[in-house]
Structure formats: structure tokens, C-alpha cells
Amino acid sequence: MMASYPEPENASGALLAPETGRAAKEPEAPPPPSPGKGGGGGTGTAPEKPDPAQKPPYSYVALIAMAIRESAEKRLTLSGIYQYIIAKFPFYEKNKKGWQNSIRHNLSLNECFIKVPREGGGERKGNYWTLDPACEDMFEKGNYRRRRRMKRPFRPPPAHFQPGKGLFGAGGAAGGCGVAGAGADGYGYLAPPKYLQSGFLNNSWPLPQPPSPMPYASCQMAAAAAAAAAAAAAAGPGSPGAAAVVKGLAGPAASYGPYSRVQSMALPPGVVNSYNGLGGPPAAPPPPPHPHSHPHAHHLHAAAAPPPAPPHHGAAAPPPGQLSPASPATAAPPAPAPTNAPGLQFACARQPELAMMHCSYWDHDSKTGALHSRLDL
């Protein structure tokens, strides 16, 4: 009996050994977390400490408004806004130059932010920034991700666009090139360029000058011819005054050279008729000009020399060797006139229509000469 007793003990110990080994190894495995303990602890700390590598989902306007609202005095300087954003969101610790420029632009351009100057003048640099009272509720119930659309408050226009002032400055109006209505207190945005002002116009761009008048010599000679015609018509035919007036025109005409306008100008018929003592136009055409242009001695006449007595109708005819006094080309040349005496000096080649005026037989008052009898035929 004693031999059979210890066998079951060994057998039972051998059978229980693996069970005890398994029980010792089971506590090493971590127990499964309970759903009520671990879930709440992990989710509660995540919003308080955001990921530094992730950009916050807020606009720059929301970041500025958040910093101003959470300040003690409801206003902050630019450096105070920077410090709040860096402390609140570590993402902005890097690349400060980029986002800080965006913060400054939003402060200057957005009407929701008002600049408040510091007290005490220029002792400390920087101004305060605060929120406009009309924009306090621009974020619905503190949700900075959604911004409410609001009407912009009315503000007076800036100084450079005030109504009642012209766009042209005082410099443009003073220069003479400004538009009408430009006051002296204008802004000068549309001032004319310098090259259109009066100082430049006088030097480089002169104003067009009026056309030059007629030459003085032409006007003087035309007036003298008209006066001579009027005087000759008033004095009557054959008067010595008319002859003197017409002969006086040769003085200024001779001083202009051989190609003067006066020498190429024909006298009106009234002047010629009053000069030669005839009432009607000449019956015969003037003789042809000479083929040569050198002056002859019979072309010079003295204004004061008395004409010779013409022959009468009852006188005897001249001998065959003597020419008739009616031919002016072969008449005996009179005494030469002095240099200072006025007289007509016309060349035959240049004035064919006035060749008959050189004969001195036309200066008499009687109409019984041989010349008149020939012209009446």
C-alpha cells in the first residue's frame, strides 16, 4: 500500500506543473484598456496643445481680433500682437518675416482695426490697435473660423479726395496751361507737363507769326499812281499840272533798277488821255519796240524844258530831206536834262506801250497841229 501511495502525488504534480507555468506567464501580458478610462484622457489634452507643425485654421484678421480681445486693455501694439500669436500658436515661431508683413497689411487695410496714438508724444514708439465698436460681433459666438458679413461704417473721404477741390494744382494754373476751374488749392494730380508751360513755350515753341504785309515800296507806288490819276482827272485834259504829277512819278521809279515793278506796270487809260490832251482812247497802236535796248538821247526829257512851237495846218510842207515833226523817233534831240531834274526815263525795250509819251509835241494846248489831224483820221 505504501508503495502505491506516492505515485499519484508524482503524477498529480506532473500534471499540475504546466498549469502553474501558464498562470505565471499570463500576468506579463498588458491588460486590455477599459473603454471608460483611456478614451477620455487622450482626447482632452489634444485641443489644448496643438501640433506645432500644423498651421492654425484662422485668418490673419481672426488672429488679430483674438489677440486684441484677450488683452487686458482691449488694445495692443504691433509687437504685442506678434507675441500673442507666437505664444498661442507655435507654428508661427518660424518664418516670422512673411506672416508679420501680412499682419501689418491687414491692420492698415481693414476698417475693423483703429489706430490709437500713444499718450505722451514720441517718448515710446508704436501705436495701439483696437477693434472698431461696430465690428465687435463680426465673429459669430466667438467662432473665429466664420466671419459675419457686415456693412462698412461711414467715414469721411481722405484729404486727397475731398470734394470741391480741382485736380489741377496751383502750379498748373499759374503756368498758363491749366483748365478753367482749377483752384489755387488743387491737388496737382493732373498738372500739365513742364514742356507745355509758358517758360518752355516761349523758348522752343514760338507762336506762329502773322503773314508779312506788302512791301512798303509797292504800297507807296500804288498810292502815288492812284493820286496821280485822281489829280489828272480833276485838272482836266492838257493841263500842265497833270503832266507834272505824272512826270513826278518817274523819280522814285528810276531808283529801283531796270527790273522794277513800276516799270512793268502800265498806266491806266485815264492818265494817258489826260497827259496827251485827247478825250478818247488812242486810235493807233504803239510802234513796235526797238531790237536793241541801249538808251537813246531822245529818251531823256527835262521836266521844265518848254516844247517847241508845233507847225500849223496852213504851213508849208517840209522839204523832202527833212522829216515830219510827227515822227517821234527821228525828232531832233533836245538839250540834255540835268541829273537832279525829275523826268521820265523809260527804255523802249521795256515799256513799248509808253513810247508815244516821250514826244514833247503833246504838251501844247492847241488842237490844230498835224498830230491831231493824223489821229482823227
Curated annotation (Swiss-Prot):
One of its GO terms (molecular function) is DNA-binding transcription factor activity. It is found in: Nucleus. Residues 55-149 bind DNA. Residues 1-54, 277-338 are annotated as: Disordered. GO terms for cellular component: Flemming body; nucleoplasm; nucleus. InterPro entries: FH_FOXL2 (IPR047515), Fork_head_dom (IPR001766), FOX_domain-containing (IPR050211), TF_fork_head_CS_1 (IPR018122), TF_fork_head_CS_2 (IPR030456), WH-like_DNA-bd_sf (IPR036388), WH_DNA-bd_sf (IPR036390). Residues 291-301 have a biased composition (Basic residues). There is a cross-link at residue 25 (Glycyl lysine isopeptide (Lys-Gly) (interchain with G-Cter in SUMO)). Gene3D superfamilies: Winged helix-like DNA-binding domain superfamily/Winged helix DNA-binding domain. Transcriptional regulator. Critical factor essential for ovary differentiation and maintenance, and repression of the genetic program for somatic testis determination. Prevents trans-differentiation of ovary to testis through transcriptional repression of the Sertoli cell-promoting gene SOX9. Has apoptotic activity in ovarian cells. Suppresses ESR1-mediated transcription of PTGS2/COX2 stimulated by tamoxifen. Activates SIRT1 transcription under cellular stress conditions. Activates transcription of OSR2. Is a regulator of CYP19 expression. Is a transcriptional repressor of STAR. This is Forkhead box protein L2. It comes from Bos taurus (Bovine). The gene is FOXL2.
